[in-house]
Amino acid sequence: MCRIAASAYACVIFLAATAVGSAPAEAGEAVSFRANYSAGTIVVKTGERRLYYVTGDGQALRYRVGVGKAGMQWAGTAQIDGKYIKPAWASPSDTTRVIPGGSPSNPMGVAALTLSGGEYAIHGTNRPDSIGGFVSLGCIRMYNQDVMDLFQRVSVGTPVVVTR
């Protein structure tokens, strides 16, 4: 009886952890994407709270993202200028307080793709519940598993287009 109860308990814990920490089924979903961007371009549509990685032939991979709060959104073009695993983070208002990479309290999550211009990045998160919202200071937040997928697909120099 104990063995059955323990198995049932473990199953419930596993399912609860999976539901809370997982991206929805649409994460990295291949979709039609009719726009004039070259394969390999990242397009962020802040109004949709979606990031598209253009794969070519009218197709893209679509990811849910968190974007800038009201007054913190931006639009324009950039390039990926750095790729970091377990990046450290410092608050823009207090750069002396650094949260080390890999810390559960680090809002950058497991990886970051920094953007030219020096202010913004596409990165993971320690708050998966924030994905799909207007939540950041201008950065593009992704589920950790999604940013790792994108991280493996792109290189320094990848073009990024952010639209409203």
Across the structure, where does each feature detected by a protein language model lie?
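Gly/Pro-biased beta-strand-loop elements
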Residues: 27-125, 149-152
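Bacterial N-terminal signal peptides that target proteins for export
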Residues: 1-12
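Extracytoplasmic entry segments of secretory-pathway proteins
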Residues: 5-7, 17, 48
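Short, basic/aromatic beta-hairpin or loop at an interaction surface
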Residues: 129-138
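N-terminal targeting pre-sequences for secretion and organelle import
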Residues: 89, 146-164
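Short, structured beta-strand/loop micro-motifs enriched in basic residues and often containing a Trp
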Residues: 30-32, 138-144
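Short edge beta-strand segments in beta-sheet-rich domains
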Residues: 73-75, 137, 155-157
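C-terminal segment of classical bacterial N-terminal signal peptides
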Residues: 15-24
